A protein has these predicted regions:
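Electropositive, glycine- and tryptophan-enriched low-complexity nucleic-acid-binding patches
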Residues: 52-56, 109-211, 303-325
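Short amphipathic alpha-helical "interface-anchor" segments enriched in bulky aromatics
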Residues: 91, 267, 334-365
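Active-site-proximal, Lys/Arg-enriched surface segment
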Residues: 58-159, 291, 295-297
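Long, low-complexity C-terminal extensions of enzymes
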Residues: 405-453
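An internal, acidic/charged active-site-proximal segment
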Residues: 162-310, 397-403, 445-446, 451
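Electropositive nucleic-acid engagement tracts
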Residues: 5-21, 29-97, 103-104, 201, ...
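Short, conserved catalytic/metal-binding motifs centered on acidic residues
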Residues: 41, 81-95, 122, 213-221, ...
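Basic, amphipathic alpha-helical segments enriched in Lys/Arg and hydrophobic/aromatic residues
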Residues: 362-417
Length: 453
């Protein structure tokens, strides 16, 4: 399937010139080697893909959310499949001072804050295919107030111990203070971004399929995000709590006649979880796995939580480790909750491919519009590569992005060589020669041309 054919449905949001430019750029990206920058692309583009053309394309305002949605709905959506929305933030390292939105963001790869750009992404995961398709990407740009909160400047010298001196006075809740409504939250730019992007995505996908859950990593495992997901998006959250979270079992004893009904029972001891909550136990290679599920309470959350605790024990050393997952959907079975949270990691493969193959880490643009277009183009190529790979993986499951790029690159070399032949060469013969070209530099050396229809 030709790339221009895949992009033909974008006429709803792009003009004909932009579609042609995008097709030339996309074909160069899937063919080229080296860094995916504007200059690098211009060295691999065919006729109509000069550096100035690429530069003009990068300075256009393009609705990437609509572009990604049209590609997904036309080529990747499968009626009848179950879908899950997942979200995560990715950080790309950048140097200098001029790039739009540059700041210090925490990178899980480096394990510390690094200088760079951050982008929040929402994708749709097919539960049947177990693949993630990014549909919305937005840059995280901190205001001056946010930056001051994240990294405040010290205003006074602290003691040698590094802790401020405590002032004398009564400890505890001030007299006369009222209980706060946990369903009323303090909105932050991060919560506004999640609400805005979530509503935009649901408006597009709801007519096609029913979405019930939004899976997020442990950074979003708090009451504020849960209330946004429940109240604004009308979805159920699936996320992770800290492994030392103070969880309480629901009180099951007799209620006293005076005062508010007692809600909190015994505090959960992760080393001695009651066996009546155990729903699964297995042993493999001296590792015992126990899974517990119960409806529990957390004092910072407004509503009860469906909590799943996975405990792994090394039978020789008796060392233990546990993970605490939760959902606001109290009817969700433990197998489904665990599986949906595992599917959240599919978005990490989108980030990996975008950085490794499609220029998410390589772009050198500094202004807002070119930066947005470079990132949108990278995630568009992630979705286009899914479509192109599906053509070969039906027969050759191990066919990878590297094999795809090797195949396109080999055909490009063949095209340049065939231009040296006389003009009377049969076009049908040229097409057959291109199909028979071996993928030079491919990871898998099987003859790819035997897979072509």
């Amino acid at each position: 399937m030709d790339i221009i054919t895949l992009l033909s449905g974008l006429s709803q949001c792009l003009d004909e010139t932009s579609i042609k430019q995008l097709a030339v750029i996309a074909k160069a990206m899937v063919t080229m080697s080296g860094q995916v920058t504007m200059l690098g692309m211009s060295r691999w583009t065919e006729r109509g893909g000069s550096y100035r053309t690429i530069q003009r394309f990068y300075n256009k305002v393009i609705p990437w959310g609509v572009v990604l949605w049209l590609v997904f709905s036309k080529h990747l959506y499968r009626p009848g499949d179950e879908y899950l929305v997942v979200g995560d933030e990715s950080v790309v390292s950048k140097a200098g001072q001029e790039t739009y939105g540059i700041d210090r963001f925490f990178s899980s790869i480096f394990g510390k804050p690094v200088r760079g750009l951050a982008f929040f992404t929402l994708s749709v995961v097919s539960v049947n295919e177990r693949k993630s398709y990014p549909l919305l990407v937005e840059q995280v740009v901190r205001s001056a107030q946010e930056a001051a909160v994240v990294s405040p400047k010290p205003t006074a010298k602290q003691s040698k111990a590094g802790k401020p001196k405590q002032t004398s006075g009564k400890v505890g809740r001030p007299k006369g203070s009222k209980a706060k409504d946990k369903r009323t939250i303090e909105w932050t730019p991060e919560l506004r971004r999640l609400e805005r992007m979530g509503k935009s995505l649901l408006e597009r996908i709801t007519p096609l399929c029913l979405i019930r859950h939004l899976a997020l990593d442990g950074h979003f495992g708090n009451n504020n995000v849960t209330q946004v997901v429940r109240q604004s998006l009308n979805l159920h959250i699936i996320s992770k709590l800290r492994n030392d979270s103070a969880l309480y079992l629901c009180y099951e004893g007799a209620q006293h006649g005076v005062g508010a009904p007692k809600r909190y029972g015994a505090k959960l001891d992760y080393d001695q979880i009651p066996t009546k909550y155990r729903v699964h136990a297995s042993t493999e290679k001296q590792i015992q796995t126990e899974i517990y599920q119960a409806t529990m309470l957390h004092k910072t959350f407004a509503d009860p939580l469906n909590v799943v605790v996975m405990v792994k024990t090394h039978l020789v050393t008796q060392k233990k480790a546990h993970v605490v997952l939760f959902s606001s959907d109290l009817t969700l079975a433990y197998e489904k909750l665990i599986d949906d949270y595992r599917l959240r990691f599919q978005i990490e493969f989108n980030f990996r491919d975008a950085k490794q193959f499609w220029g998410f880490e390589d772009f050198m643009n500094v202004n807002k519009t070119p930066v947005t277009n470079a990132v949108g183009l990278a995630f568009l190529m992630v979705n286009l590569s899914h479509i192109l790979l599906a053509r070969y993986r039906t027969t050759f499951p191990d066919f990878s992005v590297l094999d795809l790029k090797a195949l396109f690159r080999s055909r490009r070399y063949a095209q340049e060589a065939l231009k040296l032949l006389p003009d009377f060469v049969d076009p049908l013969l040229i097409a057959q020669l291109l199909d028979a070209m071996p993928p030079l530099g491919a990871i898998h050396s099987e003859p790819i041309f035997t897979l072509n229809p």
